[in-house]
Amino acid sequence: MVNVLINGYGSIGKRVADAVAKQDDMKVIGVTKTKPDFEARMAVEKGYKLFAAIPERKHLFEEAGIPVEGTLDDIIEDADIVVDGAPKKIGKANLENVYKKHGVKAIIQGGEKAGDAQDSFNSLWSYDRCYGKDYIRLVSCNTTGLCRSMYAINSVADILKARIVLIRRAADPNDVKTGPVNAIVPNPVTVPSHHGPDVVSVIPELDGKIMTSAVIVPTTLMHMHSIMVETSGTNRDEIIDALAKTPRILTLKASEGFDSTATIIEYARDLGRSRYDLNEIAVWEESVNVVDNEVYMMQAIHQESDVIPENVDCIRAMLEMESDNLKSIEKTNKAMGLIK
């Protein structure tokens, strides 16, 4: 049983904490918050030991009546690994100023740059490369989703060229500061977007073969990808079969009512998923087509949760708990109650 510390109990951190708590080979020894908000109070109510991420703010938790065990410095030495859930750029600072200082292994999230850590993690592609490493970046929700679908295609044919258009959600449901509310925004307006190079950080063999562009639209539920991949040769049945065999990919049919991201999220709700999380990505089966060996398909990504099982697998890889990535994936999925 290894000790996991969650530094930053926010959108990602609270989900990783719950996922780790469900495993039988790891435990959450504590979570941190920078301020005494409702998430901090709920962390304590769920049984997590709460620590102040910033020592000077410990008294704020006490004044708010939220039990706090101490500060980050009081618990970090007990951790075998830290999962950083801090906002973009803060993770890198934590890595340099906190984790390396204390000599503790750490996972930073996809908002940081590839060069900020020793490698970039995806359970299907880079588990072996990250095995035993000290500092790893867990790639973003979009990159995670693309890595899964590229894995499926690559299992039946060589990828010659990949072109992806990303239709990104404007903000998470709890974010009232981000937009747009009434616009479609190229983000970035230049091509390629950062997503292609980010995929290459996980799959180096796609260097020079992947091109991405991205726009932001006024929705909060999910991202969507329109994928076009030139291959060495395949057909629709092979791709459908490959998607079915690839972990953490669901093939859903519009003919059965899955005609939008809204109905996919409704499905997650009906499954009884906590926070309506869909850790699996969803591919519309009717969108899958192959013309002259070029694969076309559309997929949806739940931006708050598809990276969560990958964090668990990354812990096992970095702490050398399981050498077989597929066994780790299966173990994580079973504990979290994933469909596949």
Curated annotation (Swiss-Prot):
Cellular component GO terms, alphabetical: cytoplasm
Active site: 141
A molecular-function term among this protein's GO annotations: glyceraldehyde-3-phosphate dehydrogenase (NAD+) (phosphorylating) activity
Taxonomy, superkingdom: Archaea
Keyword field contains Oxidoreductase: yes
Pfam family, one: DapB_N
Transmembrane regions listed in the UniProt entry: none
Annotated binding of D-glyceraldehyde 3-phosphate, by residue: 140-142, 195-196
Intracellular or extracellular location(s): Cytoplasm
Assembly, per entry: Homotetramer.
Family classification: Belongs to the glyceraldehyde-3-phosphate dehydrogenase family.
Name assigned to this protein: Glyceraldehyde-3-phosphate dehydrogenase
Organism of derivation: Methanococcus maripaludis (strain C7 / ATCC BAA-1331)
The encoding gene: gap
